[in-house]
Regions:
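Residue register of alpha-helical TPR repeats
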Residues: 61, 101, 138, 175, ...
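Amphipathic alpha-helical segments of tetratricopeptide repeats
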Residues: 46-50, 84-91, 124-129, 161-166, ...
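"A position-specific structural signal for the A-helix of alpha-solenoid helical repeats
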Residues: 28, 65, 98, 105, ...
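N-terminal leader/linker segments that initiate helical-solenoid repeat arrays
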Residues: 17-68, 72, 80, 326-327
Length: 329
C-alpha cells in the first residue's frame, strides 16, 4: 500500500509540473491536487495566479479551489486572500452563481479550526442560497458534523438520517457515511459506526480520495481495539502510516491506541495507566476522540477519569468571512 501511495503522489507531482508548464491551466489536474495534495496545490496556485495570460474563468477557478485547499491546510493568509479575490468585480457573476459552494467551503475552513458555531452559521447561510438537492444534502452532513463536535450528536444524527443517500454521488455518500459513523459512535453504537466507516472508505476509494480513505480508517482503529481485533488494527495502521501528515495530525490519539494495544497484546489482567497514557488521553480528547477514549476506559476498566473534549481553536479565522454572500444574516 505504501508503494502504491508513493506512485499516486508521483503522478500528482507530474501533474503539477504539467499544470505549471501548459499555456492553459489544467483545472482538472489542479483540482486533483487540491483533493490529494493540498499543500502542493497551494504552491501551484501562487505560481499560476502570477501569470498575465489567464482567462477570467481560469483565474476564478484557481481562487475558488485555493479556498478549498487552504481550508484543509490551515493556510489562513491564502484562505483570506483567495476569498477577497472572489469578491472582486471581475468574478462577481461567477461567485454569485457559486454562492452556496463558497459559503460551504468557508464553513469547512471554520470547522477544521474547531470554530464550529461559525461553521454552522455559514452552512445555514448556504442552505438559503440556490443549490442542487445534492449540495443541500452535503450541507446537512456538514451541519451534522459541526453539531457532533459540539457534543450534540443526536441533532446531527437526525439531520443525517433525513438525507436520501441513494440520490448522492459516491464522494458525497462517503462524507455522509463518515458523519453517520461519528454520530452513532458518540451515541454508543460502536458496531454500527464501524460499518459506516468501512463503507465510507470504500466510497472514498472509488472517488480516488486516498487521503480520506486513511482519515476515516483512523476512526476504525479505535473500534478494532475495542473488539480486541489486533490483526485488523495492525493491518489498517500500516496503511495509515503511508500518510505522515495524518500521523502528525492525530499523534495523541494514535499514541493512546499504541500504548493501549501494547498492554492488551501482553494479556495483562490489569492494565497500567502511565503518565504518557494520561497525556495521550487528554490530547486525543482535544482532537475530537473523547468518546472513543472513554469507550476504551470503560471497556478495559482503566484507572483513569473520563475525558471531555476541550476543543482548541487552531489558527482561528476572523468571524463571518462569508458575510458578503449572506447579506440577510
Amino acid at each position: 500500500m505504501k508503494k502504491y501511495w508513493c506512485w499516486v503522489m508521483t503522478i500528482l507531482v507530474l501533474g503539477l509540473l504539467a499544470l505549471m508548464s501548459n499555456a492553459e491551466v489544467d483545472i482538472d489536474a489542479f483540482e486533483s491536487l487540491v483533493k490529494n495534495a493540498p499543500d502542493e496545490a497551494l504552491k501551484a496556485y501562487q505560481n499560476e495566479i502570477a501569470r498575465a495570460d489567464l482567462a477570467v474563468t481560469d483565474l476564478y477557478q484557481l481562487h475558488y479551489l485555493a479556498v478549498r485547499a487552504s481550508a484543509r491546510t490551515f493556510n489562513n493568509p491564502i484562505f483570506i486572500k483567495a476569498l477577497d479575490m472572489l469578491k472582486a468585480p471581475p468574478f462577481k457573476t461567477l461567485a454569485d452563481e457559486d454562492r452556496a459552494k463558497i459559503l460551504t467551503n468557508i464553513g469547512v475552513g471554520y470547522r477544521r479550526r474547531n470554530q464550529n458555531e461559525q461553521a454552522i452559521w455559514h452552512y445555514r447561510c448556504a442552505m438559503n442560497a440556490p443549490a442542487s438537492l445534492q449540495h443541500k444534502s452535503a450541507l446537512k452532513v456538514n451541519i451534522a458534523i459541526a453539531y457532533t463536535r459540539l457534543e450534540q450528536p443526536a441533532i446531527g444524527y437526525n439531520l443525517l438520517k433525513s438525507v436520501d443517500r441513494e440520490m448522492l454521488p459516491s464522494f458525497m455518500q462517503a462524507g455522509l457515511l463518515t458523519a453517520l459513523g461519528n454520530a452513532t459512535f458518540a451515541m454508543g453504537e460502536a458496531d454500527t459506526a464501524l460499518s459506516y466507516y468501512i463503507d465510507a472508505a470504500t466510497h472514498y476509494a472509488k472517488d480516488e480520495n486516498y487521503r480520506a480513505v486513511k482519515q476515516v480508517s483512523i476512526n476504525s482503529l479505535g473500534i478494532y481495539v475495542l473488539h480486541s481485533d489486533f490483526s485488523s488494527y495492525h493491518k489498517m495502521l500500516a496503511d495509515i502510516t503511508a500518510e505522515p501528515s495524518l500521523i502528525e495530525d492525530n499523534q495523541h490519539y494514535l499514541g493512546w491506541l499504541r500504548e493501549l494495544v501494547q498492554q492488551l497484546e501482553q494479556n495483562k489482567q490489569a492494565l497500567t495507566v502511565s503518565t504518557t497514557m494520561k497525556a495521550y488521553s487528554l490530547g486525543a480528547a482535544n482532537a475530537g476522540y473523547a468518546s472513543m477514549v472513554n469507550a476504551h476506559i470503560d471497556k478495559f476498566n482503566l484507572s483513569l477519569p473520563k475525558v471531555t473534549s476541550q476543543l482548541t481553536i487552531r489558527d482561528p479565522l476572523p468571524v463571518e468571512l462569508g458575510k458578503a454572500w449572506c447579506p440577510n444574516r
